[in-house]
Amino acid sequence: MPESQGVSPGAESQGVSPVPESPGVAPVPGLPRVPSAAEPVPPLTSLVAVPDDPGIARLHALVAARRDEMVALRRDLHAHPELARTEERTTRVVADRLAAAGLQPVLFPGTGLMCDIGERTDGRPRVALRADMDALPIPDTCGEPYASTTRGVAHACGHDVHTAALLGAGLALADLEAAGELDVAVRLLFQPAEEVQPGGSIGVMAAGGLDGVGQVFALHCDPKVDVGRVGTRIGPITSASDEVHVALRGPGGHTSRPYLTADVVFALGQVITQVPAVLGRRLDPRSGVNLTWGSVRAGSAANAIPASGTLTGTLRCLDVRAWEAAAEVFEAAVRDVVEPYGVDLEVRCQRGVPPVVNDESSTHLLDAAVRDVLGPDAVVLTEQSLGGEDFGWYLTRTPGSMARLGTRVPGGHTYDIHQGDLRVDERAIEAGSLVLARVALLAGRR
């Protein structure tokens, strides 16, 4: 673990920007509307009743007391998104708020931070709670008054919600610690760079983020699930994901004489269409292998065959064993497909992330935490997705579980992540804070 770079309570802070008033975005006819920034966010109790258990009711009260603050903080982060490994402002905002609560955040090299709450007793390990903080290089089209102020960058995957929810959970746990009511040791992990391969989690582990940790938990926004509900799954919940790069070179020339060229455009077309089919014959189809191209670049003139072209994409597998073999199989398939065309080839498979494989015991704890704070019907079974998540690297070191936090207005429009129009029901922040705090309490008492 690096030497502490704690932020003092008196450190200068940019604070949270005030949210301008606005009439908001016109609702879709016939669908419930997400409240605009000019309107207060309804309390979570508009969806779920506060439990009778005194301890859980107290946790509800502590989280609810900061509802407006955490919503404002989330909107501030949404308005000021930062790409992977540049989350300097986000790190300062979170660190300053933790320091103001009397805590001692420790900055990671570059960006991101961790913060311990409570003391380890009897040699018991800490429980880690993780949120990612980075945004995406996508224009923000959500239409909210707190939309991104950074051109071409948006919180289109809900990491602003993750950050606010974890901060709310951490402050509630700090309240319990200050009152002498916290009997578990917790570590908050505010992680940078989830959206780039192989992910910021590797740097967090290298900096000692999992040292002394026995279990780790996280939530990820799911706009297909109603707010107040959480999707859980034992075993793999995401896929493995690698980035692939193909570059072809050869003699270019006039389009009237392709036989005098290597025609890299035609060869690229063969790679695009044929390699996915080849993979389906060389890898077990039950592994759910999926090759999807994201970019193709070649040429600039209609009557000239270019001398070079490139492809990039993602290679995903549901099964970790297939993932371990996929890079070699992919590279061989590309070479076999382009061999007849006489082009020079460079092919690279950049290792990304393994599947997130949820530990059974940890997932049962998450289920219990969700039911405790959100009600007996709040847990829903979720499917394994083809999305990648670098939380999977943590689970190669430490048992844990990730769940999907519902963000959809009940009965409302279903948005999707990695799209600039993503909008969330901000009651999810309060729900996420409660679930994270409660699972830490349950896990620490085992």
Tell what function each PLM region has.
Residues P40, L44-L47, P51, A100, ...:
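Metal-dependent amide/peptide-bond hydrolase catalytic core
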Residues L77, L129, H159, L188, ...:
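Divalent metal-coordination and catalytic microenvironments
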Residues V41-H155, D160, A164-V184:
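Acidic/His- and Gly-rich active-site-bordering loop/insert found
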Residues G112-M114, L136-I138, G143-A154, D160-V161, ...:
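Histidine/acidic-residue-rich, glycine-tolerant segments that coordinate divalent metal ions
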Residues A128-R130, P139, V244, M402-R408:
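Non-cysteine beta-strand/loop elements that form the S-adenosyl-L-methionine
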Residues E82, D132-D134, A193-E195, D222, ...:
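Active-site beta-loop-alpha junctions enriched in small/polar residues
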